[in-house]
């Protein structure tokens, strides 16, 4: 077959097996077949020569099904009869490799289209686009594997050890359990990203990553939570969200007993007990266990705030802070108290709130003995003893313990009253004052005195009552 004289089709590069032939192949031979066929098909698609309807053999391979055909289908596919029977022998991986290299033409850059190279940021080498199992990627794998002599670089001296053999990347020394995973990893070193999104132009090294990314462009959110109505683009995100409602935490840390909803979270947490803080900030000398945490921390020093709210323009250092902030605009409060069902926008707030019901005051001031439900309240309280008031008004010079108090104070200068009661229209400078005011409309008085039974709308009123009346 001369590929240069005509259009390459998937039929030109397809090898079919009967059920009997397929069953004689061992797992590593089947994996090799899958790698070659999927890689060739993806290369055809990437240059616009793939079929509009995905071939049945590719569908089967992607779904993990066995791709064998009935014997008459195989004979009718144009494959030579001498290749229709493997003679009962069990092929070695090397034999399968050589046979597939003969039967499945290499789809290289000359066969498809002439493409320019790309420059790898890591090595500054110009590398060809259009990787397939037989041509440029195979060459790269062979040059970066840990053994000698061609295909044995991947499988070792004994081809039967291919399955389960740990393959090593010479560039970063990372180990892999299968050849396909090593190949996928090597694309990163080679800066090869053949799968491009037609909507935004972003490119990916693996097709499944492109498929996942393309869902972010679609407005459709097909996976909906039956409890709260939240919708998600991916089913895995819905499963993760639903654990919030069930409070299921099956994975427990063996060292401290802390429980997690996800196994990966538990594994990452356990590293805290073992790992050294080997990543140090050269600005403040603070140390971290993970390099990713150090990178995030450095943004504090640079002032970089890459995550901006599209509603109000406010920018944040961390994406998680932006997500929390956006709930102010949407009014979303996904975290409910299990006792009184009060809803909160942040998980940490509901955890702190539930401590009010238990009465647990775990944080004690070592100077005066006052106890607090929340650690942040203890930190703020200690400033009373030190006299520290780090937040100063730039208009009148008045200083405050808390930044929130400074913001509230500055509104007295501007006259801004941003919090309005929906019942009577009265406006307030502070959100706290609006919350207290609303209770006059509802008549709600949840804080009862244990001594006389008198009820109050706010906890501060109850505390003041107990000090004035019952502590005499």
Swiss-Prot record:
List the CDD domains.
KRAB_A-box (cd07765)
Subcellular localization(s) per the UniProt record: Nucleus
Keywords in alphabetical order: DNA-binding, Metal-binding, Nucleus, Repeat, Transcription, Transcription regulation, Zinc, Zinc-finger
Pfam families named among the record's database cross-references: KRAB (PF01352), zf-C2H2 (PF00096)
Superkingdom:
Eukaryota
Q: Which molecular-function annotations from GO does this UniProt entry contain?
A: DNA-binding transcription factor activity, RNA polymerase II-specific; RNA polymerase II cis-regulatory region sequence-specific DNA binding; zinc ion binding
As for what it does, the entry says: May be involved in transcriptional regulation.
| Family label | Belongs to the krueppel C2H2-type zinc-finger protein family.
Q: Report the protein name in the record.
A: Zinc finger imprinted 3
Q: Which species is this UniProt entry from?
A: Homo sapiens
């Amino acid at each position: 077959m001369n590929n240069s004289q005509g259009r390459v089709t998937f039929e030109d590069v397809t090898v079919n097996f009967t059920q009997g032939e397929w069953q004689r192949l061992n797992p590593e031979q089947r994996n090799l077949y899958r790698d070659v066929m999927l890689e060739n098909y993806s290369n055809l698609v990437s240059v616009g020569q793939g079929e509009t309807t995905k071939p049945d053999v590719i569908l089967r391979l992607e779904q993990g099904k066995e791709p064998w055909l009935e014997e008459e289908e195989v004979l009718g596919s144009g494959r030579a009869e001498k290749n229709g029977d493997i003679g009962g022998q069990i092929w070695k991986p090397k034999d399968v490799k050589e046979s597939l290299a003969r039967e499945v033409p290499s789809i290289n850059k000359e066969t498809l289209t002439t493409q320019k190279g790309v420059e790898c940021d890591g090595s500054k080498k110009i590398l060809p686009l259009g990787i397939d199992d037989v041509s440029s990627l195979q060459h790269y794998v062979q040059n970066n594997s840990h053994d000698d002599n061609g295909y044995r670089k991947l499988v070792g001296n004994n081809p039967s050890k291919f399955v389960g053999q740990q393959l090593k990347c010479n560039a970063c020394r990372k180990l892999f359990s299968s050849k396909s995973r090593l190949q996928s990893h090597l694309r990163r070193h080679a800066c090869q990203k053949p799968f491009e999104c037609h909507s935004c132009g972003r490119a990916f090294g693996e097709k499944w990553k492109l498929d996942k990314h393309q869902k972010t462009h679609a407005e459709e959110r097909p996976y909906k939570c039956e409890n709260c109505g939240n919708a998600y683009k991916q089913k895995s995100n819905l499963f993760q969200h639903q654990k919030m409602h069930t409070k299921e935490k099956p994975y427990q840390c063996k060292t401290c007993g802390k429980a997690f909803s996800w196994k990966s979270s538990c594994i990452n947490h356990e590293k805290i007990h073992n790992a050294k803080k080997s990543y140090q900030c050269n600005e403040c000398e603070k140390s971290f266990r993970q390099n990713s945490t150090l990178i995030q921390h450095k943004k504090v020093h640079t002032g970089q705030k890459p995550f901006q709210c599209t509603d109000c323009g406010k920018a944040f250092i961390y994406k998680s802070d932006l997500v929390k902030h956006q709930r102010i605009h949407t009014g979303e409060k996904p975290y409910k108290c299990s006792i009184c069902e009060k809803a909160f926008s942040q998980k940490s707030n509901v955890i702190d709130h539930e401590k009010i019901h238990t009465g647990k005051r775990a944080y004690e001031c070592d100077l005066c003995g006052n106890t607090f439900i929340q650690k942040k309240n203890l930190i703020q309280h200690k400033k009373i003893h030190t006299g520290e008031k780090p937040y100063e008004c730039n208009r009148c010079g008045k200083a405050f313990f808390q930044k929130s108090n400074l913001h509230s104070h500055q509104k007295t200068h501007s006259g801004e009253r941003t919090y309005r009661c929906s019942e009577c229209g009265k406006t307030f400078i502070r959100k706290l004052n609006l919350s207290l005011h609303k209770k006059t409309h509802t008549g709600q008085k949840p804080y009862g005195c244990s001594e006389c039974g008198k009820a109050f709308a706010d906890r501060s009123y109850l505390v003041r009552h107990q000090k004035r009346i019952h502590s005499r």
